[in-house]
From Swiss-Prot:
TM annotation in the entry: none
Protein name: RNA polymerase II holoenzyme cyclin-like subunit
Pfam family, one: Cyclin_N
One GO MF term attached to the UniProt entry: cyclin-dependent protein serine/threonine kinase regulator activity
Subcellular location field: Nucleus
Signal peptide range: none
Gene Ontology CC terms, in alphabetical order: nucleus
Organism phylogeny: Eukaryota, Fungi, Dikarya, Ascomycota, Pezizomycotina
Length: 301
């Protein structure tokens, strides 16, 4: 809960309501129904998974810190609140967001190196001319009004670890949940401290094993849905038998904190939806649809 978040451009300019985001996306569809009909794309969350996987590939080749990858994902989300994806080359946007995020998170990479590595993965979509990335960087900065500082939930997680006596396994699981929330609209909807608290609840209450965290997404989603309602019930019932002491401590802390409990539950439900739809994810399908769109509209030029 970094104090400077409350005065940040992130809080003042880059938090939306669900209704506002839906209106933005609907306006894109209304303005260009032909493109939406000609180039159907998967659910936004499935695209987010695909973009995240591409960023991870790029980041691994350059030993990039997770926070830079997270910042890149936020940049992509912000950019696409101003631009219809069907009028862009998403591979260039992903590469540019990565390049810019590395600079902002103080782990800069040379532009020629970034372009070369991106071409190793997507040679048909990334031109060898580095000026293309430079132009896209200018557009990205302009669309975000030069508001490039991103506050992440990782810091709050670290701050709450001793206060809530979180084990190393719980911290690792909460970290994974925070990573996953970037695959949803949550970074555009809620403050980072709310996301961090949600991640801690998932780690402490549901304790999904890391090996099956995504492999059994549907059962996990059901467990999380039930668990989320149990937490809500516990907060409203101070006299019942209640949950185990470990969870009681967390519930007690939540009840006494100034954290918006309803927002935490809504974030948990959004994560449930992500894990449910994850079962339908196909990297090949996303790649084919995006590739057809980029090539047909000559967006790779």
């Amino acid at each position: 809960m970094a104090a400077n978040y409350w005065a940040s451009t992130q809080r003042r300019h880059w938090l939306f309501t669900k209704e506002r985001l839906a209106d933005i996306r609907e306006s894109f569809r209304e303005r260009d129904k032909a493109a939406h009909s000609q180039f159907p794309l998967p659910d936004q969350r499935l695209l987010n998974i695909y973009f995240s996987q591409q960023l991870i590939k790029l980041g691994k080749r350059m030993s990039t810190r997770q926070q830079a990858l997270a910042t890149a994902q936020v940049y992509i989300k912000r950019f696409y609140t101003k631009n219809e994806i069907r009028h862009t080359n998403p591979y260039l946007v992903v590469t540019t967001a990565f390049y810019l995020a590395c600079k902002m998170e103080e782990c800069p990479q040379h532009i020629r190196f970034v372009v070369a590595e991106a071409r190793n993965f997507w040679p048909e979509f990334i031109a060898p001319d580095v000026s293309k990335l430079g132009e896209c960087e200018f557009a990205l900065i302009s669309e975000m009004n030069s508001q490039l500082i991103v506050h992440h939930p990782y810091r709050t997680l670290s701050e709450l670890q001793p206060e809530l006596s979180l084990t190393s396994d719980e911290v690792a699981l909460a970290w994974s949940v925070i990573n996953d929330h970037y695959l949803t609209d949550l970074p555009l909807l809620y403050p980072p401290h709310v996301i961090a608290v949600m991640a801690i609840i998932v780690a402490v209450v549901f304790k999904p094993s890391q090996t099956s965290f995504h492999g059994t997404a549907a059962p996990l989603a059901g467990a999380m849905r039930d668990g989320g309602m149990n937490i809500l019930a516990a907060l409203g019932d101070k006299n019942g038998a209640g949950p185990p002491p470990r969870i009681q401590k967390l519930v007690g802390w939540l009840a006494e904190s100034e954290v918006d409990i309803r927002a935490v539950i809504e974030c948990t439900q959004e994560l449930v939806s992500l894990y449910e739809i994850w079962e339908n994810y196909s990297e090949k399908h996303c790649k084919e649809l995006l590739g057809r769109m980029v090539k047909s509209k000559n967006l790779d030029k």
